[in-house]
């Protein structure tokens, strides 16, 4: 399992892309997707919602459990991935590509996000 170097990671197992025009993409890591098992339902924040770093903003339901989705940053949701709502298996099959969850206009990024190497060491993945 490989964690893309260009992303940053939270200890809640979300990833964050670099901000493009102040907007970053958020998803869950392959480690989290594997731990969840087959994802069957995704609830995402809605466009216009304000999300806060470290707080819940949705949930992922798998055949094993229901897990909260945490935002790695504070900001306004500008897009939710309807493809992943329609086909939750994308979270498992492509967590770093088509399985992204939402895009957020970042107002504040916490200082404790991890690099790919730090996340790999933290998660053991």
Swiss-Prot record:
Q: Which residues form the Lipoyl-binding domain?
A: 23-105
Record text on cofactor binding: Binds 1 lipoyl cofactor covalently.
Keyword annotations for this protein, in alphabetical order, are: Lipoyl
Q: Does the keyword Glycosyltransferase apply?
A: no
Q: Name one GO biological process term.
A: glycine decarboxylation via glycine cleavage system
Residues bearing the modification N6-lipoyllysine? 64
Q: Which cofactor does it need?
A: (R)-lipoate
Looking at the UniProt record for this protein, which Gene Ontology cellular component terms does it annotate, in alphabetical order?
cytosol; glycine cleavage complex
Query: What does the function comment of this entry state?
Result: The glycine cleavage system catalyzes the degradation of glycine. The H protein shuttles the methylamine group of glycine from the P protein to the T protein.
Query: To which protein family does this belong?
Result: Belongs to the GcvH family.
NCBIfam families, per the entry: gcvH, PRK01202.1
Tell me the subunit arrangement. The glycine cleavage system is composed of four proteins: P, T, L and H.
List the protein's name: Glycine cleavage system H protein
Source species, please? Answer: Streptomyces avermitilis (strain ATCC 31267 / DSM 46492 / JCM 5070 / NBRC 14893 / NCIMB 12804 / NRRL 8165 / MA-4680)
